[in-house]
Design a protein with these regions (language model features):
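Short, structured helix-loop boundary elements
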Residues: 14, 18, 42, 46-50, ...
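Hydrophobic alpha-helical bundle segments that form small-molecule/ligand-binding pockets
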Residues: 37-42, 62-68, 73-77, 88-114, ...
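Hydrophobic/aromatic-rich alpha-helical bundle segments in the mid-to-C-terminal region
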Residues: 71-72, 80, 100-146
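An amphipathic alpha-helix signature
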Residues: 46, 50, 54, 88-95, ...
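Hydrophobic alpha-helical connector segments
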Residues: 15, 19, 23, 33-61, ...
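Non-catalytic cap/lid and distal C-terminal segments of serine-dependent acyl enzymes
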Residues: 82, 88, 92, 96, ...
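Helix-turn-helix
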Residues: 1-15
Length: 154
């Protein structure tokens, strides 16, 4: 399918990026929800979170279109809002796990931590795919260590 033929179905580039972003958002939320749904202890969170980060990184490395979608969302205010809403939704899955693990913790603090960890993860992935592969791998490993230290803190 050529780019020109896409414009038969979409009025402009923004509409194409929006449709791709919505599709990716739905698929990623289903994956994240499934991965975190059964987590009941710190070890399970560590494993599930690490696997999700690795999947996300591999996806960005394997699918250049993901980079294009991200670039397109950054260039458009409405698309940035879509991405922000997606990030909040994904952070809610993480918050649910944190609440199960720390039922007496301040819920607002857990929400803030989950949202910030999620946003930092997205930034870490973008940085990792912008540098040489070996450095990107190190950055992703460092992010996982830092994020898990915060998520698993008592």
């Amino acid at each position: 399918l050529s780019i020109g033929s896409l414009y038969q179905f979409f009025p402009d580039k923004r509409a194409i990026i929006w449709a791709l972003a919505e599709r990716y958002t739905a698929e990623s939320q289903a994956c994240i929800s499934a991965a975190l749904a059964g987590v009941g202890d710190a070890e399970g969170l560590g494993q599930a979170f690490s696997e999700l980060v690795d999947i996300y990184y591999r996806l960005f490395l394997a699918e250049p279109v993901m980079r294009d979608i991200w670039s397109g969302t950054q260039a458009d205010k409405a698309l940035r809002q879509l991405e922000l809403a997606d990030s909040r939704a994904n952070a809610e899955f993480l918050t649910a796990v944190l609440r199960r693990l720390r039922p007496t913790a301040d819920p607002t603090a857990l929400e803030t931590t989950a949202f910030l960890v999620w946003q930092m993860g997205e930034a870490a992935m973008r940085l990792a795919i912008s540098v040489e592969r070996q450095e990107g791998d190190r950055l992703v490993a460092a992010y996982k260590r830092m994020a898990l230290r915060e998520l698993l803190a008592e």
